[in-house]
Amino acid sequence: MPSPPTPLTANNSPDKMSGVYGRTFWLAYLANSTLILGNALTFRFAELVNHLGGTESDTGIIVALGTAVAVLVRLSVSHVLDDYGTRRMWPLCAMLFVVGCASFLVPTDLSWVIYVARVAYFVGLTGMFACSMTHIQNHVPPERRTEIIGNLGSSGFVGMIVGSNIGDLVLRLVPDKRTQFVILFGGAAAIGLVYLVIVILLTRDQPHPRTASSPPAFRLLFRFWPGAVVLAAMIMGLGVTATQTFLTRFATSQHIDGIAAFFSGYAISAFVFRLLVSNWSRTIGRHWMLVRGLLGHVVGHALLAFATEWWHFIPASIVCGFGHALLFPAVVSLGSGAFPKECRGSGTAIILGFTDFGSLVFAPVLGWIIVHHGFTAMYLTSSGAALVTACAYAVVAWNHPDEEAARSTARTPDVNKHGTDRGYQPVEK
């Protein structure tokens, strides 16, 4: 059980709170909500592939290709984010997202165009998330990073609810398949343009003093290896693929009317739990947050495996939302915190890259399982993978107490000579 809320200290006093939750935070909050709204409209991507003549296995391969390119981009040019700053890189990623969403409307059959469009869309999307997380982390003290990442992430839940319900409404009211996808993916591109404007407003006065060029991502990764948290990041990628990519086809196969019930319940649950557990990183620590988040995915995906009615999505969504509320901020904070502050952009991109790598590894596997053994086997597989990872990471949590909680208790920062977070000490090589 978590310990009682941390008493009011210099680190969470009203003055400190007002400094953290100022104009920068709320503009970033609006931007992230807009991004998730646009992305939620693309949850019907598997339906688009099916409309173009593809199967779930084809969907898995397309998703894996887009993810593979995104991972390569992260690892090869992630240092550019530190060198040039979010003010330059963030708008570029947003424009790539817009181009990708618009390009989904070009092909009339399953051609190379859909592969290129998926690459552009996903590279842009992952870059936008990396810029957003890097930007907000650089505006708060180290001991508040997990809290601020979690609270910023809560902004996306409104967008997820609205976007998934719009998707269901479009499919229900618009009979023509082609028109459905024009509305969904064209709408995502238009929302991406709105996001671009918000990002420009958010970063236009942001200075970025040039320092020595950051080392390449591979060198940083070997020097400041984040540890076992990369396994949890990969399971996050598995969870994203199992729900955001394949749930729509699962609902269709089960003759369930839409996926809005799942994503609405998921978003509401994650938002509520994110508020309820916002101080857990400073009480039970991020390692145990991560274990509990993984267990949420274990139960949630197991429940999805046996869903036959729309309301069966609700209990699964609540448990999955709980898992996401804990897992995402803990993974990003632990992973990026292993890197020095001057390399925080690269560190954030790298740990999110392991999430993408999880999608890359598991998307074709899940697609193959669906084609040969069905959706029930696929969701039981994803649940089992999360369970194995949770058990393995529990050993880490038991043997490596999180020093973010220790710092909060001591009321003094505790960083090593590189300025990195010592919640799980990186390995220097």
Map each language-model feature to its residues:
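C-terminal membrane-cytosol helix-exit motif in multi-pass small-molecule transporters
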Residues: 168, 189-209, 392-397
